[in-house]
């Protein structure tokens, strides 16, 4: 049975898609109802009053008809803002888009994921405020892996549990190996010690308690390459938004 309820909800606009000549399908990440697709009639008309409230990266409180299955509908925007810097800056936009794409891939639609709504909202706030977008994205990537069914031990050796020796990532062992056990996997990643330490921190720290982390461009790239490999070979996804960031990095060289 497809139940319908008129309700207020907190949401973040993930993306929009054209539907027919004048309509849009707009996907929201909501606090109360998970990821939902909303049908917005006449949204492409120039005089549509809610247009600014349904642009990508708009966020706030809305009211509408929430259907348990199929498309939902928005009646009004009650208190909506825009992540202005993300919306206007191509680099921030790219990382924020990738973060939202990851969440879209990790969870089914119409399933309540309140804790992840809160984390993603915090990530976007931090990115919009000028914090290191790549580090915030790495944190989300690493912590989302469990939601894809990938459990990795990041903070100690999977064989002996030691934390006092340099660690390196081993796909074969599903986590870190300490220096005493590196010979067990000749195909380990050969991470630099600082990269391994930063990954351990990002895997465990709450995004609500994340402070300033000073990381070199080389270290960030090493972490980025590792997560790309894990998502491609273990999760089985290679998002276009990641490829765009890779291309964007080449522009900076």
From Swiss-Prot:
Please indicate if the UniProt record lists DNA repair as a keyword: yes
Q: Which UniProt keywords apply?
A: DNA damage, DNA recombination, DNA repair
A single GO BP annotation from the record? Answer: double-strand break repair
Residues annotated as transmembrane: none
Gene3D superfamilies (alphabetical): Nucleic acid-binding proteins, Recombination protein O, C-terminal domain
Q: What does the UniProt record say this protein does?
A: Involved in DNA repair and RecF pathway recombination.
Family the entry assigns: Belongs to the RecO family.
Entries under PANTHER family matching the protein: DNA REPAIR PROTEIN RECO
User: Can you name this protein?
Assistant: DNA repair protein RecO
């Amino acid at each position: 049975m497809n139940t319908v309820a008129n309700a207020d909800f907190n949401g973040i606009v993930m993306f929009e898609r054209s539907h027919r000549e004048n309509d849009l399908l707009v996907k929201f990440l909501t606090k109360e109802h998970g990821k939902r697709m909303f049908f917005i009639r006449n949204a492409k008309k120039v005089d549509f009053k809610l247009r600014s409230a349904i642009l990508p990266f708009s966020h706030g409180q809305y009211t509408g008809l929430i259907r348990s299955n199929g498309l939902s509908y928005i009646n009004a925007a009650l208190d909506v803002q825009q992540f202005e810097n993300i919306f206007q800056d191509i680099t921030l936009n790219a990382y924020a888009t990738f973060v939202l794409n990851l969440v879209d891939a990790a969870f089914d639609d119409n399933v309540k994921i309140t804790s992840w709504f809160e984390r993603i909202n915090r990530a976007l706030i931090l990115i919009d405020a000028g914090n290191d977008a790549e580090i915030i994205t790495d944190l989300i990537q690493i912590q989302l892996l469990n939601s894809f069914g990938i459990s990795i031990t990041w903070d100690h050796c999977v064989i002996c549990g030691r934390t006092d020796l340099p660690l390196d990532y081993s796909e074969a062992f599903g986590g870190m190996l300490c220096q005493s056990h590196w010979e067990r996997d000749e195909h380990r990643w050969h991470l630099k010690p600082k990269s391994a330490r930063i990954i351990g921190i990002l895997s465990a720290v709450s995004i609500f308690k994340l402070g300033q982390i000073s990381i070199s461009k080389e270290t960030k790239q090493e972490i980025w390459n590792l997560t790309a490999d894990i998502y491609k070979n273990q999760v089985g996804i290679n998002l276009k938004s990641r490829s765009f960031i890779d291309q964007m990095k080449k522009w900076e060289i």
